[in-house]
Regions:
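N-terminal assembly/interaction segments in proteins that build large macromolecular machines
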Residues: 2-200
């Protein structure tokens, strides 16, 4: 078993935001391999985030993003369980990153799939079925279903990879949220947003 140094624990904490004991355990389980420990903590923190999902979120922050050309702006509300986390730098940075993403992607209309009204889904499904009318009958429904899934990814926030792919390693907003939730030990919820664009 590899000797775990305080410097390794600090580096892992800085990279993941996990607690000291979690970092020590992850390093011990991976024989001091930092990269493997990061992966292990992501898995564990993700599981922890799932367990936090049912807790009430009565605190949070509203953050704004105004594009440098002053033609697009976004307000976003991100909620959590305590005012302590609402003031946390990582939490506030996440809310700002979400606002920036929404500003960059004009197709977003809803936070998640659950918010898309059934009548809107039905209307889109009918359009996709008509577009596939010339295909064999046995594949029409699958084509329409695939197009609906792709459309939902375009119009809902949480399933989209963040526009800053380099910083977030191509992760979706939901994956980033789940990691943050696990890191902070609280439920983190993107509640709502408003996007404003000149001339839109």
């Amino acid at each position: 078993m590899a000797q775990i140094s305080a410097a390794q624990v600090k580096e892992l904490r800085d990279r993941t935001g996990a607690g000291m004991m979690d970092c020590k355990k992850a390093l011990a389980e991976t024989d001091g391999d930092i990269e493997k420990a990061v992966e292990l903590l992501r898995v564990k923190l993700g599981d922890k985030a799932l367990k936090l999902g049912g807790r009430e979120t009565s605190e949070g922050t509203v953050q704004a993003y105004i594009h440098s050309n002053a033609k697009v702006g976004v307000l976003v509300e991100v909620d959590c369980n305590t005012d302590f986390v609402a003031r946390n730098d990582d939490f506030v940075a996440f809310a700002r990153a979400v606002a920036m993403h929404i500003a960059a992607v004009p197709t977003i209309k809803w936070v998640s799939d659950d918010e898309v009204p059934q009548e809107v889904r039905d209307a889109e499904t009918r359009v996709f079925e008509q577009q596939a009318a010339d295909k064999p009958e046995q594949v029409r429904a699958k084509i329409a279903e695939g197009k609906l899934r792709k459309w939902l990814e375009e119009v809902t926030l949480m399933n989209q990879p963040h526009v800053n792919a380099d910083r977030y390693d191509g992760k979706t907003i939901e994956q980033i949220r789940a990691e943050l939730s696990g890191q902070l030990g609280e439920n983190v919820v993107v509640r709502r947003f408003a996007r404003f664009a000149v001339g839109a």
